[in-house]
Amino acid sequence: MSWQLIFTDQYTRKAARFIKNHPDIIVQYTKTLQLLEINPHHPSLRLHGLQGRLDGLYSVSINLKFRITLETIVTEREIILVNVGDQGRFTDQSGC
């Protein structure tokens, strides 16, 4: 059984800006979303919980530089996408 990805309006805007700024990783980004939908615990995603201001959110890696933050609703098998961008920019949640 697969997971349902929830694309909020805010995430969709951030993702569009991210893809515009980083067209070279569209294939990696797409593969990350596909794998997240099939198995969010796959080792290549490097799923881990965040701490501090982002406590309660999780992160998966697109590659070594970029990641996606997300919420999971385990009972519903839903994943709400929150942000996408550079690893260093997640402290302010500004996106890319």
Could you describe each region identified by the protein language model?
Residues 12, 51, 91:
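Nucleotide phosphate-binding site architecture
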Residues 34-60:
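A short, surface-exposed loop/turn module that caps and links secondary-structure elements
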Residues 4, 65-67, 71-96:
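Enriched for short, Lys/Arg-rich terminal
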Residues 1, 43-46, 77-80:
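Residue-level signal for beta-strand positions within conserved beta-sheet cores that form or flank
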Residues 1-32:
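Arg/Lys-rich, positively charged N-terminal/basic patches that mediate binding to nucleic acids
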Residues 27-28, 44-48, 93:
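Short, hydrophobic secondary-structure boundary micro-motifs
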